[in-house]
From Swiss-Prot:
Cofactor: a divalent metal cation
Transmembrane parts of this sequence: none
Protein's UniProt name: Structure-specific endonuclease subunit SLX1
Subunit structure: Forms a heterodimer with SLX4.
Native species: Eremothecium gossypii (strain ATCC 10895 / CBS 109.51 / FGSC 9923 / NRRL Y-1056)
Function in brief: Catalytic subunit of the SLX1-SLX4 structure-specific endonuclease that resolves DNA secondary structures generated during DNA repair and recombination. Has endonuclease activity towards branched DNA substrates, introducing single-strand cuts in duplex DNA close to junctions with ss-DNA.
Enzyme class: hydrolase
Length: 301
């Protein structure tokens, strides 16, 4: 899986990100990309093709990628999140009474930028996407968990990089460049892991589907992707797998939706239009509905 949009219209990877200038620590930039490694290199002038004009400001290069939000089901969803993060004073995804940034030009501190990120993750439109926040810097992690505006919620999935960087060892050019190289390496490892995890899951699912007829664990309907592939007029049934590597659960996607929706109704008293998560009927681990749907779309393409 590369960084292109799949035939089902689902990106293999897409994230929004927060950059911070290494020499000017109070300068930030918010953007989005299907390939954070390539984009970070563009921002730092290592790649001339691809723009990144706004990060060419005098004295701000090189930049480090401080935080990312990934798991978007489409490029459009990522661009909506990016725009809302950039314009917190007017976005419809934050209620007027909840706004931390109330006017254009405000919200420049790291506390405010991360607080806006949390507010966006609270909105139902983004909440059902089960987005993942990844933090690459020790001081960014401290700000996140300090939670100055008291906006933390247990449903926000946060990944803390084990090798997160501390502050640059000095202000000289050599120290700044070394810090930038280490940050780029962290982003490379993160991006590679993300693609590999999805690729390995999809490879295993395709292998199982190539065996032919499979029975839904819920309605017992027979699904045969091999047979459907031979028929130009037949649309493939959307299917669901458990992504626990030791679980062999398989069902129609619609059947699992009914299970997740019913379980969420029991927990909350409300029938969800889109469930956020649910337990695998076979192994009982918590599964992200958005992730299951994303895999299902790739498999049916």
């Amino acid at each position: 899986m590369g960084d292109d949009i799949g035939t089902a219209g689902v990106p293999a990877f897409y994230c929004c990100y927060l950059l911070r200038s290494i020499p000017k620590r109070l300068s930030y930039y918010i953007g989005s990309t299907p390939n954070p490694v390539r984009r970070l290199r563009q921002h730092n002038g290592l790649l001339t093709k691809g723009g990144a004009y706004r990060t060419k400001r005098q004295g701000t290069r090189p930049w480090e990628l401080a935080a990312s939000v990934s798991g978007f089901p489409s490029k459009i969803a990522a661009l909506q999140f990016e725009h809302a993060w950039q314009h917190p004073y007017q976005t419809r995804f934050i209620k007027s009474e909840d706004r931390i940034v109330k006017k254009k030009g405000g919200g420049r501190s790291i506390h405010q930028r991360l607080a806006v990120l949390k507010l966006l993750l609270h909105h139902p439109f983004f909440k059902v996407m089960s987005l993942v926040v990844h933090l690459f810097s020790e001081d960014i992690q401290r700000v996140w968990f300090l939670d100055k505006y008291k906006l933390e919620a247990p449903f926000i999935h946060v990944e803390v990089d084990e090798d997160a960087l501390s502050e640059p060892t000095g202000e000289d050019e050599e120290s700044v460049i070394e810090h930038a190289k280490k940050n780029l390496r962290l982003v490379e490892l993160f991006y590679g892991r993300s693609l590999k995890e999805d690729s390995e899951c999809l490879e295993e699912y395709r292998r199982r589907l190539q065996n032919g007829a499979m029975r839904c664990a819920i309605c017992e309907k027979i699904v045969d992707y091999v047979k459907d592939s031979d028929s130009f007029s037949s649309e493939k049934e959307l299917v669901a797998f458990c992504y626990n590597s030791v679980c062999d659960y398989f069902s129609c996607l619609s059947c699992l939706y009914n299970v997740f929706a019913s379980d969420e109704e029991l927990r909350t008293g409300e029938i969800p239009l889109i469930p956020t998560s649910g337990q695998c009927p076979n192994c009982n681990i918590e599964l992200s509905w958005a992730r299951i749907v994303r895999y299902s779309m790739f498999l049916s393409a």
